[in-house]
Amino acid sequence: MLQGKQLILATKPFAKENRAKSWYYTISTLLILIASLIGTVYNFHWTLKLACSIFAGLVIVRLFVIYHDHQHKAILDKSPIATAIFTLFGFYVLAPSGIWSASHDYHHKNNCKLFSASIGSFPIYTKKKFEKCSKSERFHYLFIRHPLTILFGYIFAFMYGMCIKSMINRFSKNIDSLIALILHFSYQIAVFYFLEWQTWILLCAIPHFISGAMGSYLFYAQHNFPSVTFVGNEEWTYEGAALDSSSFMKLNPFMHWVTAYIGYHHIHHMNSRIPFYRLPEVWDAIPEMRSAKTTSLKPKDIIACFKLKVWDYEKQKMVGI
Protein backbone atom coordinates (compact mmCIF):
# COMPACT_ATOMS: atom_id res chain seq x y z
CA MET A 1 0.00 0.00 0.00
CA LEU A 2 1.40 3.37 -1.04
CA GLN A 3 1.81 5.96 1.70
CA GLY A 4 3.24 9.42 2.22
CA LYS A 5 5.60 10.68 -0.45
CA GLN A 6 5.25 7.40 -2.36
CA LEU A 7 1.74 8.53 -3.26
CA ILE A 8 2.98 11.85 -4.60
CA LEU A 9 5.61 10.05 -6.70
CA ALA A 10 2.96 7.66 -8.03
CA THR A 11 1.02 10.60 -9.47
CA LYS A 12 3.98 12.08 -11.37
CA PRO A 13 3.44 10.11 -14.61
CA PHE A 14 0.01 11.75 -14.88
CA ALA A 15 1.39 15.28 -14.54
CA LYS A 16 1.93 15.53 -18.28
CA GLU A 17 -0.57 17.20 -20.56
CA ASN A 18 -1.69 16.23 -24.02
CA ARG A 19 -1.29 19.65 -25.66
CA ALA A 20 -3.90 18.95 -28.33
CA LYS A 21 -6.42 17.88 -25.69
CA SER A 22 -5.70 20.95 -23.59
CA TRP A 23 -6.37 23.22 -26.56
CA TYR A 24 -9.46 21.26 -27.57
CA TYR A 25 -11.06 21.51 -24.13
CA THR A 26 -10.11 25.17 -23.76
CA ILE A 27 -11.37 26.32 -27.17
CA SER A 28 -14.49 24.13 -27.18
CA THR A 29 -15.50 25.33 -23.71
CA LEU A 30 -14.87 28.95 -24.70
CA LEU A 31 -17.00 28.55 -27.84
CA ILE A 32 -19.80 26.87 -25.86
CA LEU A 33 -19.74 29.79 -23.42
CA ILE A 34 -19.86 32.36 -26.23
CA ALA A 35 -22.73 30.49 -27.93
CA SER A 36 -24.64 30.29 -24.63
CA LEU A 37 -24.20 34.01 -24.00
CA ILE A 38 -25.34 34.85 -27.54
CA GLY A 39 -28.36 32.63 -26.88
CA THR A 40 -29.36 34.86 -23.98
CA VAL A 41 -29.77 37.76 -26.43
CA TYR A 42 -30.93 36.16 -29.68
CA ASN A 43 -33.43 33.35 -29.27
CA PHE A 44 -36.97 32.29 -30.16
CA HIS A 45 -38.51 32.56 -26.70
CA TRP A 46 -37.64 33.99 -23.29
CA THR A 47 -37.58 30.47 -21.78
CA LEU A 48 -34.78 29.50 -24.17
CA LYS A 49 -32.95 32.71 -23.30
CA LEU A 50 -33.25 31.82 -19.61
CA ALA A 51 -32.02 28.26 -20.26
CA CYS A 52 -29.00 29.66 -22.12
CA SER A 53 -28.34 32.08 -19.24
CA ILE A 54 -28.36 29.30 -16.63
CA PHE A 55 -26.22 27.05 -18.81
CA ALA A 56 -23.75 29.89 -19.38
CA GLY A 57 -23.31 30.16 -15.61
CA LEU A 58 -22.40 26.47 -15.46
CA VAL A 59 -19.99 26.75 -18.40
CA ILE A 60 -18.22 29.66 -16.67
CA VAL A 61 -17.53 27.25 -13.78
CA ARG A 62 -15.97 24.76 -16.20
CA LEU A 63 -13.83 27.39 -17.91
CA PHE A 64 -12.77 28.73 -14.52
CA VAL A 65 -11.40 25.31 -13.53
CA ILE A 66 -9.54 25.15 -16.85
CA TYR A 67 -8.19 28.67 -16.16
CA HIS A 68 -7.20 27.45 -12.69
CA ASP A 69 -5.24 24.58 -14.28
CA HIS A 70 -3.40 27.03 -16.52
CA GLN A 71 -2.46 29.06 -13.43
CA HIS A 72 -1.04 25.86 -11.91
CA LYS A 73 0.98 25.39 -15.14
CA ALA A 74 -0.74 22.04 -15.61
CA ILE A 75 -1.91 22.96 -19.13
CA LEU A 76 -0.79 25.26 -21.95
CA ASP A 77 2.15 26.62 -20.00
CA LYS A 78 4.29 29.21 -21.81
CA SER A 79 1.68 29.69 -24.53
CA PRO A 80 1.23 33.44 -25.20
CA ILE A 81 -2.17 32.83 -26.80
CA ALA A 82 -3.42 30.80 -23.83
CA THR A 83 -2.06 33.39 -21.42
CA ALA A 84 -3.93 36.14 -23.28
CA ILE A 85 -7.19 34.15 -23.30
CA PHE A 86 -7.00 33.29 -19.62
CA THR A 87 -5.90 36.78 -18.57
CA LEU A 88 -9.03 38.21 -20.20
CA PHE A 89 -11.15 35.46 -18.65
CA GLY A 90 -9.70 36.27 -15.22
CA PHE A 91 -10.85 39.87 -15.68
CA TYR A 92 -14.27 38.64 -16.83
CA VAL A 93 -14.87 36.56 -13.68
CA LEU A 94 -13.19 39.04 -11.28
CA ALA A 95 -10.35 36.65 -10.49
CA PRO A 96 -7.31 38.36 -12.07
CA SER A 97 -4.28 36.12 -12.38
CA GLY A 98 -2.09 38.11 -9.96
CA ILE A 99 -4.17 37.75 -6.80
CA TRP A 100 -5.59 34.38 -7.83
CA SER A 101 -2.15 32.80 -8.27
CA ALA A 102 -0.75 34.27 -5.05
CA SER A 103 -3.71 33.32 -2.87
CA HIS A 104 -4.25 29.91 -4.45
CA ASP A 105 -0.60 28.91 -4.26
CA TYR A 106 -0.67 29.83 -0.56
CA HIS A 107 -3.78 27.70 -0.15
CA HIS A 108 -2.07 24.64 -1.63
CA LYS A 109 0.97 25.04 0.61
CA ASN A 110 -1.07 25.61 3.77
CA ASN A 111 -4.32 23.76 3.14
CA CYS A 112 -5.99 22.74 6.42
CA LYS A 113 -3.31 23.99 8.78
CA LEU A 114 -5.07 25.12 11.93
CA PHE A 115 -2.79 28.04 12.69
CA SER A 116 -2.01 29.61 9.32
CA ALA A 117 -3.45 32.75 7.78
CA SER A 118 -6.76 32.28 5.99
CA ILE A 119 -5.43 33.37 2.61
CA GLY A 120 -7.20 31.82 -0.35
CA SER A 121 -9.48 29.70 1.83
CA PHE A 122 -12.28 29.90 4.37
CA PRO A 123 -11.04 30.66 7.91
CA ILE A 124 -11.02 27.87 10.50
CA TYR A 125 -11.16 28.63 14.22
CA THR A 126 -10.84 26.10 16.99
CA LYS A 127 -13.75 25.95 19.41
CA LYS A 128 -11.61 27.48 22.17
CA LYS A 129 -10.42 30.32 19.95
CA PHE A 130 -13.98 31.09 18.87
CA GLU A 131 -15.17 31.20 22.49
CA LYS A 132 -12.44 33.75 23.31
CA CYS A 133 -13.35 36.01 20.38
CA SER A 134 -15.22 39.29 20.76
CA LYS A 135 -18.75 39.60 19.37
CA SER A 136 -17.50 41.47 16.32
CA GLU A 137 -14.83 38.84 15.63
CA ARG A 138 -17.40 36.06 15.93
CA PHE A 139 -19.76 37.90 13.60
CA HIS A 140 -17.03 38.40 11.00
CA TYR A 141 -15.96 34.74 11.19
CA LEU A 142 -19.51 33.39 10.92
CA PHE A 143 -20.40 35.88 8.18
CA ILE A 144 -17.59 34.62 5.94
CA ARG A 145 -18.76 31.02 6.41
CA HIS A 146 -22.50 31.79 6.19
CA PRO A 147 -24.54 30.04 3.45
CA LEU A 148 -25.86 33.38 2.14
CA THR A 149 -22.33 34.77 1.86
CA ILE A 150 -21.36 31.73 -0.19
CA LEU A 151 -24.57 31.95 -2.24
CA PHE A 152 -23.61 35.51 -3.15
CA GLY A 153 -20.03 34.47 -3.88
CA TYR A 154 -20.00 36.69 -6.97
CA ILE A 155 -20.08 39.71 -4.65
CA PHE A 156 -18.28 38.52 -1.53
CA ALA A 157 -15.70 36.02 -2.83
CA PHE A 158 -14.87 37.51 -6.21
CA MET A 159 -15.84 41.19 -6.38
CA TYR A 160 -14.80 41.97 -2.80
CA GLY A 161 -12.46 39.13 -1.81
CA MET A 162 -10.44 38.86 -5.00
CA CYS A 163 -10.50 42.45 -6.23
CA ILE A 164 -11.47 45.12 -3.70
CA LYS A 165 -9.79 43.50 -0.68
CA SER A 166 -6.58 42.79 -2.59
CA MET A 167 -6.36 46.47 -3.60
CA ILE A 168 -6.98 47.61 -0.02
CA ASN A 169 -4.27 45.27 1.28
CA ARG A 170 -1.63 46.00 -1.36
CA PHE A 171 -2.66 48.25 -4.21
CA SER A 172 0.73 48.44 -5.95
CA LYS A 173 0.89 44.63 -6.28
CA ASN A 174 -2.72 44.25 -7.43
CA ILE A 175 -3.25 46.77 -10.22
CA ASP A 176 -4.83 43.98 -12.27
CA SER A 177 -7.64 43.83 -9.68
CA LEU A 178 -8.50 47.45 -10.53
CA ILE A 179 -8.33 46.65 -14.24
CA ALA A 180 -10.67 43.69 -13.68
CA LEU A 181 -13.23 45.86 -11.89
CA ILE A 182 -13.09 48.60 -14.54
CA LEU A 183 -13.47 46.17 -17.46
CA HIS A 184 -16.10 44.08 -15.66
CA PHE A 185 -18.37 46.99 -14.83
CA SER A 186 -17.75 48.74 -18.15
CA TYR A 187 -19.11 45.80 -20.10
CA GLN A 188 -22.08 45.44 -17.75
CA ILE A 189 -22.94 49.16 -17.96
CA ALA A 190 -22.71 48.95 -21.77
CA VAL A 191 -25.06 45.95 -21.83
CA PHE A 192 -27.51 47.68 -19.49
CA TYR A 193 -27.46 50.92 -21.51
CA PHE A 194 -27.54 49.57 -25.07
CA LEU A 195 -29.46 46.29 -24.62
CA GLU A 196 -31.68 47.24 -21.63
CA TRP A 197 -32.12 45.68 -18.20
CA GLN A 198 -33.82 42.44 -19.30
CA THR A 199 -30.82 41.51 -21.41
CA TRP A 200 -28.45 42.56 -18.61
CA ILE A 201 -30.16 40.11 -16.24
CA LEU A 202 -29.86 37.22 -18.71
CA LEU A 203 -26.45 38.04 -20.18
CA CYS A 204 -24.67 39.25 -17.03
CA ALA A 205 -26.47 38.90 -13.70
CA ILE A 206 -27.65 35.28 -13.84
CA PRO A 207 -24.46 33.71 -15.29
CA HIS A 208 -22.20 35.55 -12.83
CA PHE A 209 -24.50 34.79 -9.90
CA ILE A 210 -24.62 31.05 -10.70
CA SER A 211 -20.89 30.71 -11.34
CA GLY A 212 -20.00 32.77 -8.26
CA ALA A 213 -22.30 30.75 -6.00
CA MET A 214 -21.23 27.39 -7.36
CA GLY A 215 -17.54 28.24 -7.39
CA SER A 216 -17.67 29.48 -3.81
CA TYR A 217 -19.56 26.43 -2.58
CA LEU A 218 -17.27 23.97 -4.35
CA PHE A 219 -14.25 25.61 -2.77
CA TYR A 220 -15.95 25.60 0.64
CA ALA A 221 -17.24 22.02 0.60
CA GLN A 222 -14.02 20.50 -0.68
CA HIS A 223 -12.29 21.48 2.56
CA ASN A 224 -15.24 21.83 4.95
CA PHE A 225 -17.03 18.49 5.16
CA PRO A 226 -17.97 16.28 8.15
CA SER A 227 -14.96 13.92 8.06
CA VAL A 228 -12.32 16.58 7.31
CA THR A 229 -9.16 16.63 9.42
CA PHE A 230 -7.23 19.72 10.53
CA VAL A 231 -3.80 19.62 12.17
CA GLY A 232 -1.22 21.93 13.66
CA ASN A 233 1.65 23.26 11.58
CA GLU A 234 4.13 20.74 13.03
CA GLU A 235 1.98 17.72 12.14
CA TRP A 236 1.03 18.94 8.67
CA THR A 237 2.16 17.03 5.58
CA TYR A 238 1.38 17.75 1.94
CA GLU A 239 0.02 14.27 1.25
CA GLY A 240 -1.95 14.26 4.51
CA ALA A 241 -3.64 17.53 3.57
CA ALA A 242 -4.61 15.99 0.24
CA LEU A 243 -6.06 12.73 1.57
CA ASP A 244 -7.46 13.77 4.95
CA SER A 245 -8.43 17.39 4.36
CA SER A 246 -9.60 17.45 0.74
CA SER A 247 -12.72 15.68 -0.47
CA PHE A 248 -13.83 13.67 -3.45
CA MET A 249 -17.15 15.13 -4.56
CA LYS A 250 -19.52 12.48 -5.90
CA LEU A 251 -21.16 13.91 -9.02
CA ASN A 252 -23.05 12.65 -12.05
CA PRO A 253 -21.28 12.71 -15.45
CA PHE A 254 -22.83 16.04 -16.46
CA MET A 255 -21.74 17.78 -13.26
CA HIS A 256 -18.25 16.28 -13.56
CA TRP A 257 -18.15 17.92 -17.01
CA VAL A 258 -19.39 21.25 -15.60
CA THR A 259 -16.80 21.21 -12.82
CA ALA A 260 -14.01 19.91 -15.09
CA TYR A 261 -13.35 17.06 -12.62
CA ILE A 262 -12.34 19.40 -9.78
CA GLY A 263 -14.46 17.10 -7.61
CA TYR A 264 -11.41 14.81 -7.61
CA HIS A 265 -10.03 17.44 -5.31
CA HIS A 266 -7.89 15.17 -3.16
CA ILE A 267 -5.99 14.10 -6.28
CA HIS A 268 -5.61 17.70 -7.39
CA HIS A 269 -4.11 18.54 -4.00
CA MET A 270 -1.80 15.55 -4.17
CA ASN A 271 -0.33 16.92 -7.41
CA SER A 272 -1.62 20.20 -8.82
CA ARG A 273 0.33 19.71 -12.07
CA ILE A 274 -2.04 16.95 -13.20
CA PRO A 275 -4.32 18.28 -15.99
CA PHE A 276 -8.00 18.23 -15.02
CA TYR A 277 -8.88 15.69 -17.73
CA ARG A 278 -6.37 13.19 -16.29
CA LEU A 279 -7.67 13.25 -12.71
CA PRO A 280 -10.07 10.31 -13.36
CA GLU A 281 -7.09 8.34 -14.73
CA VAL A 282 -5.32 8.71 -11.38
CA TRP A 283 -8.48 7.58 -9.59
CA ASP A 284 -8.56 4.41 -11.72
CA ALA A 285 -4.82 3.70 -11.58
CA ILE A 286 -4.01 4.25 -7.89
CA PRO A 287 -6.26 2.28 -5.47
CA GLU A 288 -5.30 4.45 -2.49
CA MET A 289 -6.98 7.42 -4.16
CA ARG A 290 -10.31 5.61 -4.15
CA SER A 291 -10.44 5.62 -0.34
CA ALA A 292 -11.01 9.38 -0.32
CA LYS A 293 -13.34 11.17 2.06
CA THR A 294 -16.47 12.19 0.19
CA THR A 295 -19.23 14.73 -0.09
CA SER A 296 -21.76 15.56 -2.83
CA LEU A 297 -24.21 18.18 -4.04
CA LYS A 298 -27.16 16.34 -2.51
CA PRO A 299 -29.19 18.59 -0.17
CA LYS A 300 -28.37 16.50 2.92
CA ASP A 301 -24.63 16.77 2.24
CA ILE A 302 -24.84 20.51 1.56
CA ILE A 303 -26.71 21.02 4.85
CA ALA A 304 -24.17 18.84 6.68
CA CYS A 305 -21.28 20.95 5.34
CA PHE A 306 -22.96 24.24 6.23
CA LYS A 307 -23.56 23.08 9.82
CA LEU A 308 -19.80 22.89 10.42
CA LYS A 309 -18.45 26.00 12.14
CA VAL A 310 -15.40 25.32 14.33
CA TRP A 311 -12.75 22.66 14.92
CA ASP A 312 -13.22 20.81 18.20
CA TYR A 313 -9.70 19.84 19.26
CA GLU A 314 -10.90 17.31 21.85
CA LYS A 315 -13.31 15.54 19.48
CA GLN A 316 -10.94 15.97 16.53
CA LYS A 317 -13.71 17.03 14.17
CA MET A 318 -15.61 20.03 12.86
CA VAL A 319 -18.72 20.84 14.90
CA GLY A 320 -21.54 23.35 15.00
CA ILE A 321 -21.94 26.05 17.62
Predicted regions and their residues:
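Juxtamembrane/interface helices at transmembrane-helix boundaries
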Residues: L50, E196-I206, I210-Q222, P226-F230
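Histidine-centered catalytic micro-motifs
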Residues: L63-H72, W100-C112, L218-S227, V258-I274
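Non-catalytic, topology-defining segments of multipass membrane proteins
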Residues: M1-V59, I66, T83, G90-A205, ...
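A glycine-rich, aromatic-flanked flexible loop/lid motif
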Residues: L181, P253-A260
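Membrane-interfacial segments at transmembrane helix termini in multi-pass membrane proteins
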Residues: S216-F254, L297
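Short alpha-helical scaffolding segments that buttress acidic/His motifs in well-ordered protein cores
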Residues: L88-F89, V258
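Alpha-helical transmembrane segments and their membrane-interface exit regions
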Residues: F55-L63, F209-S216
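Helix-loop junctions on the outward
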Residues: H70-P80
